[in-house]
């Protein structure tokens, strides 16, 4: 990936991130079309723990959001990954992977682990795996995965920030 810069979002990036996210999920069969609104609600609630953009030739071509999650109603130091958006013309080219790896690298010293809801075939390459004792309501267990950095794996029901449900 030549000449791609990954950096935290700035306030000036918000509109481009929204447009990118809408385009990235436009034809995704698993999408309900609310990903851009989720990011906007997380931003408005000051709940984006980390929001990274990938820039090439002055344009945002990718974005990854990370926000706190609760387990059993408690903040145990875990974070949730998502949404992750890549421009349709750049998908399957490593941009999303680069954003995820950078975000995980930045968070692993300050958080205990990360959750993701998504394709196990994709997210396993980053170390995500189904973790017994952790649940996320309404999804098949194989699509809800964790990556643990510190301590014993927690148990309980995981909840993303309320911005994910409106």
Model-identified regions with their sequence ranges:
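Conserved acetyl-CoA-binding loop-helix of GNAT-fold acetyltransferases
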Residues: 81, 86, 92-105
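Active-site rim helix/loop that mediates acceptor-substrate recognition in acyltransferases
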Residues: 18, 25-65
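A conserved beta-turn-beta hairpin within the catalytic core of GNAT-like acetyltransferases
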Residues: 69-80, 91
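Conserved GNAT-family N-acetyltransferase fold
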Residues: 52, 62-64, 79, 84, ...
């Amino acid at each position: 990936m030549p000449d791609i810069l990954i950096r935290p979002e700035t306030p000036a990036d918000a509109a481009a991130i929204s447009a990118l996210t809408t385009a990235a999920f436009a034809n995704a069969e698993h999408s309900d079309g609310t990903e851009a609104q989720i990011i906007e609600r997380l931003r408005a609630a000051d709940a984006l723990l980390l929001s990274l953009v990938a820039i090439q030739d002055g344009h945002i071509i990718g974005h990854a959001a990370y926000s706190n999650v609760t387990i059993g109603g408690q903040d145990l130091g875990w974070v949730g990954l998502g949404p992750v958006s890549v421009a349709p013309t750049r998908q399957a080219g490593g941009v999303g992977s680069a954003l995820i790896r950078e975000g995980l690298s930045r968070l692993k010293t300050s958080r205990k682990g990360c959750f993701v809801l998504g394709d196990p075939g994709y997210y396993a390459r980053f170390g995500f795996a189904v973790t017994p004792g952790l649940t996320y309501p309404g999804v098949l267990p194989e699509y809800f995965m964790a990556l643990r950095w510190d301590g014993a794996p927690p148990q309980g029901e995981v909840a993303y920030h309320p911005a994910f449900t409106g």
